[in-house]
Curated annotation (Swiss-Prot):
<keyword id="KW-0399">Innate immunity</keyword>
<comment type="subunit">
    <text>Monomer.</text>
</comment>
<dbReference type="GO" id="GO:0042742">
    <property type="term" value="P:defense response to bacterium"/>
</dbReference>
<feature type="disulfide bond">
    <location>
        <begin position="7"/>
        <end position="36"/>
    </location>
</feature>
<dbReference type="GO" id="GO:0005576">
    <property type="term" value="C:extracellular region"/>
</dbReference>
<keyword id="KW-0044">Antibiotic</keyword>
<dbReference type="GO" id="GO:0045087">
    <property type="term" value="P:innate immune response"/>
</dbReference>
<feature type="disulfide bond">
    <location>
        <begin position="5"/>
        <end position="40"/>
    </location>
</feature>
<keyword id="KW-0964">Secreted</keyword>
<feature type="disulfide bond">
    <location>
        <begin position="10"/>
        <end position="32"/>
    </location>
</feature>
<keyword id="KW-0929">Antimicrobial</keyword>
<keyword id="KW-0391">Immunity</keyword>
<feature type="disulfide bond">
    <location>
        <begin position="17"/>
        <end position="54"/>
    </location>
</feature>
<protein>
    <recommendedName>
        <fullName>Locustin</fullName>
    </recommendedName>
</protein>
<comment type="function">
    <text>Has antibacterial activity against Gram-positive bacterium M.luteus.</text>
</comment>
<keyword id="KW-1015">Disulfide bond</keyword>
């Protein structure tokens, strides 16, 4: 867990069927998960993408 991360359970690292949030091979089941990842890792690299896709 990254120091300062307030939601360690929020991130999904395994491939999943993401409904709306995805980037490369990492998907998020919700916007919360995506925002938590971005905050914990100090990046805004992961953005919202349209459509559904298994990644």
């Amino acid at each position: 867990a990254t120091t300062g991360c307030s939601c360690p359970q929020c991130i999904i690292f395994d491939p999943i069927c993401a409904s709306s949030y995805k980037n490369g091979r990492r998907g998020f089941s919700s916007g919360c998960h995506m925002r938590c990842y971005n905050r914990c890792h100090g990046t805004d690299y992961f953005q919202i993408s349209k459509g559904s896709k298994c990644i």
